[in-house]
Amino acid sequence: MQYPLISEYVKAIQDGSDNLDKLAYLTPVLDNHGEPYRSSGAFAVVFKMLDKRTGKYYALKCFTEEQEGRADAYRQIADELDMVDSSYITSVKYMEKELFVDSQCEEDEFPVLLMDWVEGETMEAYISANYHNQSAMSMLCYRFGKMAAWLRSQSFAHGDVKPDNIIIRPDGYLTLVDYDGMFVSSMKGCKSPTIGTKDFSHPLRTMDDFDETIDDFSLASIALSLKAISMKSTLLDIYGASDRLLFSENDY
């Protein structure tokens, strides 16, 4: 299936009340330039939406690339997360043919993923701004450790734990986002859609490694980096980079 360009999605979201089906009550939040507020990644663009009736904000994810089995996977993920009551995770809802987009594609109706909007900044951005603050980094190290312990006790796994996929909320607590590579118990025996991000993944991880333990190495690597940085911030200046912490794939 071919998907629209980000620019085509932007035009569709600008008139969301006309182009959305069941979610027509949502309106886009605009940035300082009057454009729909958004962030984009390799396979999708995410818009910040507002339900004016309740004042609640949502994240609306629109896909730009095909991913085999995505619809079925997200239905299973949604079912699993619907039973989870934790601030570390947000609920998701996959909706087929929800958004009409005038594009060059053969199709004109496309799926979306609806999630609660998590206010805050990525852990990557937070560390960049605060790594010289020993108190802030020590608290982050503690809170990450609590989240890691919770995640390892669950029957599911995130699949791509890294600082850019963790939001630090204004109250300082953490929430995992981006569930494209998530494992849930109903997927046992399936292949993983991803092997995670190289600088945070076990070097021997393959598509066949897909169970509730796939986050263990990433969690350990990040926890070790955070502890070291909290004790000696200059380590990040020496060994770090903009898209990772102290370790790269060449270190494993």
Pin down the residues of each PLM region:
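Conserved structural core of kinase catalytic domains
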Residues: 89-138
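Juxta-kinase regulatory segment immediately upstream of eukaryotic protein kinase catalytic domains
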Residues: 1-37, 72-74
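Catalytic-loop of the protein kinase fold
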Residues: 148, 152-164, 168-169
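ATP-binding glycine-rich loop module of kinase domains
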Residues: 34-36, 42-93
